[in-house]
């Protein structure tokens, strides 16, 4: 995907607030944002090609031809834990800033590349999960 998406939209905003490496911010957000994207796609755009791409990614990540999208999300989350990447709050992101971060992320140019427009509530849920 040459476009970026909500993970990078969040990372740009959060990177200006805390002294955490861009890659670590992205890693902390990848599973929750992927989960939010998949849920939103299934609810609002069930025929979107991104769902097939997420399933193919899950197969590649897990090495299993029967892998589900959920298996891929769990693989990402497990890998992030194994790498010792902490949540964003441990990196210094104040939970009181969640609404501000969500607002700025929603209007970020990177977020416009997301496979589906996430609502502020969906963005907030993903960010809180990454804390």
Residue ranges and their predicted role:
Residues 95-131:
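Short, amphipathic C-terminal "tail helix"
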Residues 12, 31-32, 129:
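Short, residue-level hotspots on alpha-helical faces of the histone-fold
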Residues 11, 73, 98-102:
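Short amphipathic alpha-helical surface patches that serve as generic macromolecular interface elements
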Residues 17-20, 24-97:
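Gly/Pro-rich interdomain helix-loop hinge
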Residues 1-26, 108-113:
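Glycine-rich phosphate/pyrophosphate-binding beta-alpha loops
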């Amino acid at each position: 995907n040459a476009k970026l998406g909500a993970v990078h939209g969040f990372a740009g905003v959060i990177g200006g607030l805390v002294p955490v490496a861009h890659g670590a911010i992205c890693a902390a957000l990848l599973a929750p944002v992927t989960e939010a994207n998949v849920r939103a796609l299934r609810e609002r755009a069930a025929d979107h090609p991104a769902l097939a791409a997420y399933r193919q990614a899950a197969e590649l990540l897990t090495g299993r031809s029967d892998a589900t999208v959920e298996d891929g999300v769990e693989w990402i989350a497990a890998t992030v834990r194994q790498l010792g990447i902490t949540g964003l709050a441990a990196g210094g992101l104040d939970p009181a800033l969640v609404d501000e971060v969500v607002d700025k992320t929603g209007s970020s140019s990177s977020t416009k590349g997301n496979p589906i427009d996430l609502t502020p509530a969906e963005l907030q849920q993903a960010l809180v999960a990454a804390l």
